[in-house]
Each structure stands twice: as structure tokens, then as C-alpha cells.
Regions:
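Carbohydrate-active catalytic/glycan-binding domains of CAZyme proteins
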Residues: 23-346
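Compositionally biased, low-complexity segments
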Residues: 4, 18-21
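Bacterial N-terminal signal peptides
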Residues: 8-18
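Bacterial N-terminal signal peptides that target proteins for export
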Residues: 1-9
Length: 346
């Protein structure tokens, strides 16, 4: 999610707020405490405590800052995942300085974190797995153990193995969805016991991609073309459908960030996914969910918590239109009309 370009959209489009279509406004939390510089937040819960994991290097020199809260509003720093980038990643991807896009879930009596490594603008990337018995940093059992490589992409591949998201379908099968630029969002089946790739189903499923405009500009030297900008996939199951959330356009450029979050849905986890108008996501479809307002730019890098009684949450980052600084934001999801609606802080 760190690396991404795109030709600018018209500013008027960026000022749309997709949640306006909802008959019942979602609740947008007013956050305080340590919420700045929280890229690609992944939210989960252990006991009564909420935890958010974020991309990148920590002030202490480690990787993946952890923030925690008891009420979803007041947040503090409560540790980091790794003290340093694992040696095997440094050997496999020399020059890697940050680890990206953590995705944390609780499966098979352990917390699993899928995460990515890469270099800016390249698809020589990989997705790895770390596990922990607890998220409580005060517990004697607290220790993140790196399980190594899950999936990688090479320069000759048409996909980019970053931005992982774990999903267990309603039949109990585990999947890993991922992708950034190139040919878009992909999916592989996982082995349920190990969390690694399935050896019985090696299919690389295609879920979503951007459509090439007729006036597309040539790709910058050594970089993918701007029109390919789709990444940060996240899938949830709701009301008989799988909903695929992705981030489009430009991330991580402060006041020039043009990220926005879009969504489509399918009856089967492997697709085909369509947007609210029926346009396939493999043909560039996507219904806007989060787009900029006058105060916050580039909302994206989302993760979702599906709670009891439809108490569902979406967490993401956005950029302060005054300072260009990124910050974490949090909204409930309103499912009016069987499509999600969420909001930004005013």
C-alpha cells in the first residue's frame, strides 16, 4: 500500500461522500491519543481490548506499531510486532526498510498476521506470516513468531504479492486475497491447519482490476502505469454476499494523495464480483464507499471488523487537508440497501 501512483482525478469527484446514499448515517468516531501516522491499519480484538496494527517502521526501530484502546476512541501505543526485519527478508529483498500492510485475525487458537515486503514500484514482493498466542503485551505468552514466506511474486509475474487479507468463507475454507497495481487483485486458497498456501488448489483467482482508459498515459520508467492503481483488498461476508473492498488511486503523498475506497460483491468468494450498478470488478467496476471531504484526503488502506448484531467497523487512514499528515479514522458500517456505507471525520 505504500507505493502508489495515479493520474489525478478531478477535485470535485474527490469531494464526493459515498455514505450520502445511506438512509441511516454511520457513526464516525472522534479519535484521540496516538492515531497519527497510522498507515494501513488492521483492527482486531483480544478480550475487552481493541488493537490496531500499522505499516512501517516504529520510532524504536522495529516494525508494525501496535495501538490499543478500551473504548475505540482513545488510543495509545502498546508495543511493536518485530524488533527488526527478519533476516530472511533482508536476504531475499535487499534494500527493504519497512514491512507493509499487516492483516491480523484469530484462527486455530492463535493470532495470525499476514504481512508484506517489497520495494517502491516493484512487484518483486512477498507475503509472510507471523503468529502469537495473545495480543496482550503484558502477558508472558506475548511473542510474535515469524513463520516465513507464504507467497511471492517475481518481475515476470502479472501480479504483485502485497496487501494480504485473510478470509474464511461460510463453508470454512481459508483464502488469501492480495494485490496491488499490475493485473489487480488476486486470491489463493490456504491450508487451514498451517495458514500457508494449499497444495491441492493452486489456482490463482482474479477478482478485480482497473480498466485501461483510451487516453492512458505511458507508464513512468521502471514503474507500472498509473491506470492500474488498485490495491488493499479486504473481503467480508454479509447477508449472503461476499463484499470486496479495495483502494483506488494514489496513496501516501500527503496533500497529493487521491486514494479512495470502493466496493463490489459476489455470491461466491472467488467471484465474479460486481458493483452496485452491476459492472464487473474485473472490468473496472467499483461502488465508492470512502472518498475525500474538505478536511480529509485519500481515505483508504482499510480493514474491517465484523461484530455481533451488525456492529461492524471499518478503520482506514486519511490525510489532513491542512497539514498532509496521515491519521487513523474509524466508522461504523451501515448496511442500508445491502450495500455498505461509512463516513469520515468532518
Amino acid at each position: 500500500m505504500f507505493a502508489h501512483w495515479k493520474a489525478s482525478l478531478g477535485f470535485a469527484v474527490l469531494l464526493m461522500i459515498a455514505g450520502d446514499a445511506s438512509a441511516q448515517s454511520p457513526h464516525v468516531y472522534t479519535l484521540s491519543g496516538d492515531v497519527a501516522f497510522t498507515h494501513d491499519p488492521s483492527i482486531t480484538k483480544d478480550g475487552k481490548t481493541w488493537y490496531v496494527f500499522a505499516t512501517g517502521k516504529t520510532p524504536e526501530g522495529g516494525q508494525f506499531a501496535i495501538r490499543c484502546s478500551d473504548d475505540l476512541e482513545h488510543w495509545k501505543r502498546c508495543g511493536q510486532v518485530f524488533d527488526a526485519i527478519p533476516d530472511w527478508i533482508q536476504k531475499r529483498s535487499p534494500g527493504t526498510k519497512d514491512l507493509w500492510a499487516p492483516d491480523v485475525s484469530y484462527e486455530n487458537h492463535e493470532y495470525r498476521m499476514y504481512y508484506a515486503y517489497s520495494l517502491f514500484g516493484k512487484n518483486t514482493s512477498g507475503i509472510a506470516l507471523g503468529v502469537n498466542k495473545t495480543l496482550d503485551p503484558t502477558s508472558p505468552d506475548f511473542k510474535w513468531v515469524d513463520k516465513g514466506l507464504v507467497l511471492e511474486s517475481k518481475a515476470e509475474d502479472n501480479f504483485n504479492a502485497i496487501d494480504p487479507n485473510f478470509i474464511r468463507d461460510h463453508k470454512g475454507q481459508d483464502w488469501l486475497v492480495f494485490g496491488s497495481f499490475w493485473d489487480g487483485i488476486k486470491m489463493r486458497r490456504l491450508d487451514k491447519s498451517t495458514g500457508l498456501l494449499s497444495s491441492t488448489d493452486t489456482t490463482l483467482y482474479s477478482l478485480a482490476r482497473r480498466a485501461q482508459p483510451p487516453d492512458a498515459a505511458p507508464a513512468p520508467p521502471g514503474l507500472p502505469p498509473n491506470w492500474e492503481a488498485i490495491e488493499a483488498p479486504f473481503i467480508v461476508f454479509h447477508g449472503g454476499y461476499y463484499y470486496l473492498f479495495t483502494s483506488w488511486d494514489l496513496c501516501c503523498r500527503g496533500l497529493k494523495s487521491t486514494y479512495k475506497t470502493v466496493v463490489g460483491r459476489a455470491k461466491v468468494v472467488t467471484g465474479p464480483y460486481v458493483d452496485e450498478t452491476g459492472k464487473p470488478l474485473l472490468e473496472g467496476g467499483g461502488t465508492p464507499l470512502l472518498v475525500a471531504n474538505s478536511r480529509w484526503l485519500g481515505p483508504g488502506g482499510e480493514s474491517i471488523w465484523m461484530g455481533p448484531k451488525d456492529e461492524d467497523l471499518i478503520v482506514f487512514h486519511a490525510y489532513d487537508a491542512k497539514t498532509g499528515r496521515p491519521s487513523m479514522q474509524l466508522s461504523t458500517i451501515d448496511w442500508t440497501g445491502d450495500w455498505p456505507h461509512a463516513g469520515l471525520e468532518p
